[in-house]
A protein has these predicted regions:
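Short glycine-centered, acidic/aromatic-flanked micro-motifs in structured strand/loop junctions
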Residues: 15, 133-135, 159
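Residue-level recognition of oxygen-bearing side chains
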Residues: 22, 84, 138, 166-167
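Short, glycine/charged-enriched secondary-structure capping and boundary segments
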Residues: 28, 53-55, 113-116, 145-147, ...
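Short acidic loop-to-helix transition motifs that present clustered carboxylates
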Residues: 84, 106-108, 162
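Active-site/ligand-binding-proximal alpha/beta "capping" segment
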Residues: 96-144, 152-155
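Structured adenosyl-cofactor binding patch, chiefly the S-adenosyl-L-methionine
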Residues: 140-186
Length: 186
């Protein structure tokens, strides 16, 4: 991994713990897309059994390593220990931009948000972006309100409701396209 193929934007994916092998796919494809760090997250709707069973960090970090090699990444993203929702709320302040894809986001998408930030000349200060994706079953309305109060931007990913393992890919791709290197250099 000698080349620097990293994006100027660091993306931190706060992923509501999914069932079965979905986290493997999330880590593999998210690594290919340029995610910097994966933070498994325990929310109200996370299956209770998953909270005690998340013991596959070594395996997920190996998946990240292999995906980083395959996609010629300069760094290997880290998969952290799971954190609780309260810790997510604390992280909102630490990042330049924090996005929450949500099915009830009233047609306010990532492109609209980025254009608004460009018009306000705030876009050049954005280097660290958090994306919070809920688990199967989605995000509680109370969690959305708490995230909004902390300054998170609630955004739509379109008319269709995406699976938990898809939403992070779409949000990351849109961010990389709008702010970084996925769309090429114009």
């Amino acid at each position: 991994l000698d080349l620097n193929n990293e994006s100027e934007i660091k993306v931190f994916l706060f992923q509501g713990l999914p069932k079965a092998q979905k986290m493997d796919l999330i880590v593999q494809k998210g690594t290919e897309l340029g995610i910097t760090e994966f933070i498994p997250t325990i929310t109200h709707r996370v299956d209770v059994k998953l909270k005690g069973e998340f013991k596959k960090l070594d395996r997920l970090n190996r998946i990240a390593l292999e995906a980083a090699k395959q996609s010629k990444r300069s760094i290997v993203p880290k998969v952290t220990e799971p954190i609780g929702f309260e810790e997510v709320l604390q992280k909102v302040d630490e990042l330049d931009l924090f996005l929450v894809p949500y099915e009830n986001a009233n047609n306010f998408g990532i492109k609209t948000l980025i254009n608004k930030l460009r018009n306000e000349e705030k876009i050049n200060n954005i280097k660290n972006i958090g994306i919070f994706v809920g688990p199967e079953g989605g995000i509680e309305e109370e969690e959305i309100e708490q995230l909004k109060e902390k300054g998170a931007h609630i955004v739509t990913l379109g008319k269709r409701i995406l699976r938990t393992e898809t939403a992070g890919f779409v949000a990351t791709s849109l961010i990389q396209y709008e702010l970084s290197d996925l769309g090429g250099n114009d």
